[in-house]
């Protein structure tokens, strides 16, 4: 790939840091946007759409030796009813995102919104985010491309389907520890309340 001057570097469309070592963006990337990816020192690209990545991204992964995981192709299902994506795709993608050995990792789909937004929303649910905060983040990226069925999918997604990998990232471990501590504190406060004997 021809080396571009630094002033030709562009941030990919729908790009963001999800958590430390996890990024997201559209899978349709130009040569100028590919140069930006160099700064991330990626180990894995997780492709969630059925369509393959852009030619520029495919070439970049090939020349740099970045691991390509095309779950969108292997987990595609034709008859999902109302669901915008399959539960199997989101479950497997979450397990990949939560496996620290895949980091730094970039999550892409053709738009950077549909599958990627749904995956990030389900990750936030695993992180115990408030549902309003999840929807706010989803809509911030989706803009006019957002769909109610994706929000509904996130709300109804069963996080118990996800098998946590043995090498979890520190940010996830710390969030789970804090969540358990808060739950323990709420439980203690609930049972420490005096009982109203005049009831």
Predicted regions and their residues:
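Cys-dependent protein tyrosine phosphatase-like superfamily
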Residues: 1-107, 111, 118-199
């Amino acid at each position: 790939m021809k080396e571009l001057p630094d002033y030709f570097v562009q941030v990919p469309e729908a790009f963001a840091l999800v958590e430390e070592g996890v990024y997201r963006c559209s899978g349709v990337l130009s040569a100028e946007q590919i140069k930006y990816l160099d700064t991330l020192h990626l180990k894995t690209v997780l492709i969630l759409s059925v369509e393959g990545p852009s030619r520029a991204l495919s070439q970049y992964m090939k020349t740099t030796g970045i691991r390509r995981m095309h779950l969108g192709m292997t987990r595609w299902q034709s008859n999902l009813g109302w669901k915008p994506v399959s539960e199997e795709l989101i479950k497997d993608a979450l397990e990949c995102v939560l496996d620290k050995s895949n980091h730094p990792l970039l999550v892409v789909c053709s738009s950077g919104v549909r599958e990627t937004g749904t995956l990030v929303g389900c990750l936030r649910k695993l992180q115990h985010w408030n549902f309003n905060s999840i929807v706010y983040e989803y809509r911030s990226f989706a803009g006019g491309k957002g769909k109610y069925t994706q929000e509904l999918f996130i709300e109804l997604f069963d996080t118990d389907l996800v098998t946590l990998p043995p090498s979890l990232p520190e940010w996830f471990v710390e969030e789970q520890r804090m969540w358990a501590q808060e739950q323990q504190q709420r439980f203690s406060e609930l049972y420490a309340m005096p009982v109203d004997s005049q009831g």
